[in-house]
Amino acid sequence: MTEFVVLIPARLDSSRLPGKALADIHGKPMVVRVAEQAAKSKAARVVVATDHPDIQTACQAHGIEVVMTSNRHESGTTRLAEAAAALKLPPHLIVVNVQGDEPLIAPELIDRTAEVLVENNVQMATAGHELHDFDELMNPNAVKVVLDKNGNAIYFSRAPIPYPRDAMRAGKREMPSETAVLRHIGIYAYRVGFLQRYAEMSVSPLETIESLEQLRVLWHGYPIAVETAKEAPAAGVDTQEDLDRVRAVFQTV
């Protein structure tokens, strides 16, 4: 297994659930729960990257390594680029970006995403899982990804892609049958050198329109390998209902 580290971007502001990074989950802040879950992977190191002193204090209180970054970042990826530089991580080292609102993320998925980066010899890797629910296909909060024959991303979108034209014309709520529909899983792997390059790339109009940071990579002509997970991962925390569900899971552990 190639060595990798996990970096977790964490900010306090959240439009749908303010302060969620520090939301209590069975006695510990969510960001700490995420870091502890990531530590179950094969990562050599797990570090939280944040711009808020309260998150820094919470991590330090629970023995989680943390690095402070600027509060001017518009994406988690550019925050991690700054964190990697501050930590003096070597250019060849693999970084897995684990979102700060994924306290139930599977450690195996973290490992596999790093492996996919190496196996495909690409600049960036991510993951997706098959989608079978029509409402999710139409839901803009469920990001979809379509792949080429080699398993690389063609496009990510909040729109329903691929669009089932004939079924929609007929007024049918049917999923496309010719190919699998994939929902994107928000986990990324890249080497530190490419992470720094990403931060230097110009912002693409597509990422602005869709509010999807990974579209910058496609816009600038770099392939993104996509691992198709065998099953859907546990959902992250975006709303109070999500938080209540996750709290219930930890209460049973």
UniProtKB/Swiss-Prot annotation:
Pfam families: CTP_transf_3. It comes from the Bacteria. Keywords: Cytoplasm, Lipopolysaccharide biosynthesis, Nucleotidyltransferase, Transferase. Its EC number is 2.7.7.38. GO terms for molecular function: 3-deoxy-manno-octulosonate cytidylyltransferase activity. It is found in: Cytoplasm. GO terms for cellular component: cytosol. Gene3D superfamilies: Spore Coat Polysaccharide Biosynthesis Protein SpsA, Chain A (3.90.550.10). Pathway: Nucleotide-sugar biosynthesis; CMP-3-deoxy-D-manno-octulosonate biosynthesis; CMP-3-deoxy-D-manno-octulosonate from 3-deoxy-D-manno-octulosonate and CTP: step 1/1; Bacterial outer membrane biogenesis; lipopolysaccharide biosynthesis. GO terms for biological process: CMP-keto-3-deoxy-D-manno-octulosonic acid biosynthetic process; lipopolysaccharide biosynthetic process. It catalyses: 3-deoxy-alpha-D-manno-oct-2-ulosonate + CTP = CMP-3-deoxy-beta-D-manno-octulosonate + diphosphate. NCBIfam families: kdsB, PRK05450.1-5, PRK13368.1. HAMAP family: KdsB. Activates KDO (a required 8-carbon sugar) for incorporation into bacterial lipopolysaccharide in Gram-negative bacteria. Belongs to the KdsB family. This is 3-deoxy-manno-octulosonate cytidylyltransferase.
